[in-house]
Amino acid sequence: MRFDVVTLFPEMFSALTQWGITGRACQQSLASVHLWNPRDFCPDPRKTVDDRAYGGGPGMVMMAKPLEDTVAGIQASHQAAGIKSGPICLLAPQGERFSQKIATDILDYGNLSFICGRYEAVDQRFIDRNVDIQLSIGDFVLSGGEIPAMTIMDAVIRLVPGALGDGESATQDSFMNGLLDYPHYTRPEIYENLLVPDVLLGGHHAKIADWRRQKSLELTLRLRPDLIESARANGLLTREDEQFLRSL
């Protein structure tokens, strides 16, 4: 999985490329992150990437030309490597809310280019001419698109085959089956008078699977009932699931 990231702060991405699961995936060439600074595509001595907004108002606007030249550089690198360019994604508050399903869709692209905005906004003409999709990670404002981009890349890289130590880990994450994850326990069996549920100690795999499924349903109904409705609409609930939900 290849990511190309247009950012004024490429140093920020070392947190993703050097540490943890994502860092290991990059070191093993399961994922690659290519960083592109639009200042490198500015011909003027000051490397200007922003200017005042037409019509007035606070803040500066990222200029279309440096961003478009950067995208051209990305596409040229794809062509040189024999890679078909994937979608161009702008991280923006007005974007579609990122979800686990979108993470799976991105994995299918094979490569994705992120535009990490800064300042007040990005010139709309660049968006109209170049951006294929816009994504948001929530209804709040951040200083730039770098943290949302890293959030999305983390979620996608986890899905790359071989990125996780256990091949089943990603499939058992929250949201992968439309529900929240079940509770997890590790040693010791008793901690501050709190016990690990007996069913997890018995070694009966079918009973453990049933317990985990029921706990997942119970937690989802209590904390995110909207996900239950979505799972039901998408045919992800079995007859046994529905019977259990009615018993709660």
Swiss-Prot record:
Keyword set, alphabetical order: Cytoplasm, Methyltransferase, S-adenosyl-L-methionine, Transferase, tRNA processing
Q: What is its main location?
A: cytoplasm
Give the source's domain of life in one word.
Bacteria
Q: What is its EC number?
A: 2.1.1.228
Question: What would you give as a GO molecular function for this chain, any one?
Answer: tRNA (guanine(37)-N1)-methyltransferase activity
- Residues recorded as binding S-adenosyl-L-methionine, renumbered to this chain, are 117, 137-142
Q: Which Pfam families match?
A: tRNA_m1G_MT
Annotated GO biological processes are: tRNA N1-guanine methylation
> Which chemical reaction does it catalyze?
guanosine(37) in tRNA + S-adenosyl-L-methionine = N(1)-methylguanosine(37) in tRNA + S-adenosyl-L-homocysteine + H(+)
Is the keyword Transferase in the record?
A: yes
The family database entries (InterPro entries) matched by this protein are listed as: Alpha/beta_knot_MTases, tRNA_m1G_MeTrfase_C_sf, tRNA_m1G_MeTrfase_TrmD, tRNA_m1G_MTases_N, tRNA_MeTrfase_TRMD/TRM10
Q: Could you tell me which CDD domains the record lists for this protein?
A: TrmD-like (cd18080)
Subunit structure comment from the entry: Homodimer.
Q: Which family does it belong to?
A: Belongs to the RNA methyltransferase TrmD family.
Q: What is this protein called?
A: tRNA (guanine-N(1)-)-methyltransferase
Q: Which organism is it from?
A: Polynucleobacter asymbioticus (strain DSM 18221 / CIP 109841 / QLW-P1DMWA-1)
